[in-house]
């Protein structure tokens, strides 16, 4: 169960290279260096993400990206559910970059979801807005998607830089909630631990992504545990946020009774898959009992199994 992956970060490098060649484009040296593991800067990550995302210009490409996410799941195993909670940024693709229409984005997702369903994989879609663009942007995102929202669009989230307090975003989250969407937020990723508290108490967020800064305030760990707020953990993606696996807060989260699930985040950019994330999780030193609990909660709290298609 991949609890957190972004459509825009899912295209496989080989597909991107082929598509670039078809369009007579060269893959930037910085992007190739990042894929080879020779470049590690945030600038290299962004350059790679933006270049690959630039090929999401048709419904077929969108379906390919979702298919790539499905391929990164573990192989089928009796008794283990397979699913993806998929984050997408339609406003960025449709309005800001103007590289695909909303109709073609929905069509590609519908095709990809149907193909996944035939493979026994359930998919739910979460709409992502950008915190540092502010609440007005959040309302624009909802304006775009709520009019003809497919049934598999089940959630609303914010990402980006955590510069705007969640109390300012509260009306946007409330509008999304009233429209029937579940609420999530990237918090405690690049912002202070207090952003996690704000997201939960002031914006009504039901699920937190990353939350690596939560360990800085024991009261926030207690809040997450007491309210049973699920946390999406993306170990490879978090490599720039913690010194190493032995410093990742996942073991502390589980020991504190926090419900967690594993995700790949931007697997086509970071070159990771879910089996690899499980290996990294075990590398943090969690016990077999904690690993079993992590596996169970990854599925139990996944929106694709609760209300997804």
Can you annotate each of these PLM segments?
Residues 186:
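Short HxH-centered metal-ligating active-site micro-motif
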Residues 1-181, 190-195, 202-203, 207, ...:
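Metal-cofactor-binding active-site regions of metalloenzymes
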């Amino acid at each position: 169960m991949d609890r957190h992956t972004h459509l825009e970060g899912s295209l496989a490098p080989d597909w991107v290279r082929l598509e670039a060649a078809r369009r007579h484009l060269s893959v930037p040296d910085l992007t190739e260096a990042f894929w080879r593991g020779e470049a590690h800067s945030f600038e290299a990550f962004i350059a790679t993400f933006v270049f690959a995302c630039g090929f999401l210009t048709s419904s077929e490409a969108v379906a390919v990206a979702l298919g790539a996410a499905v391929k990164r799941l573990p192989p089928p195993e009796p008794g283990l559910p397979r699913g993806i909670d998929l984050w997408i940024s339609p406003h960025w693709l449709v309005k800001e970059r103007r590289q695909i229409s909303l109709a073609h984005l929905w069509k590609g997702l519908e095709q990809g979801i149907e193909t996944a369903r035939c493979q026994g994989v359930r998919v739910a879609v979460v709409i992502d807005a950008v915190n540092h663009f502010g609440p007005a942007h959040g309302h624009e995102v909802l304006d775009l998607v709520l009019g003809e929202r497919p049934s598999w669009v089940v959630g609303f989230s914010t990402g980006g830089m955590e510069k705007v307090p969640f109390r300012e975003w509260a009306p946007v989250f409330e509008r999304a909630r009233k429209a029937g969407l579940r609420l999530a937020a990237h918090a405690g990723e690049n912002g202070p631990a207090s952003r996690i508290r704000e997201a939960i108490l002031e914006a009504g967020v039901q699920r937190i992504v990353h939350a690596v800064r939560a360990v800085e305030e024991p009261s926030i760990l207690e809040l997450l545990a007491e309210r049973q707020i699920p946390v999406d953990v993306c170990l490879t993606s978090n490599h720039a946020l913690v010194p190493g696996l032995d410093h990742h807060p996942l073991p502390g989260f589980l020991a504190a009774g926090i419900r967690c699930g594993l995700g790949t985040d931007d697997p086509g950019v970071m070159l990771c898959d879910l089996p690899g994330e499980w290996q990294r999780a075990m590398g943090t030193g969690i016990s077999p009992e904690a690993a079993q609990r992590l596996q169970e909660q990854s599925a139990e709290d996944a929106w694709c199994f609760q209300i997804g298609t």
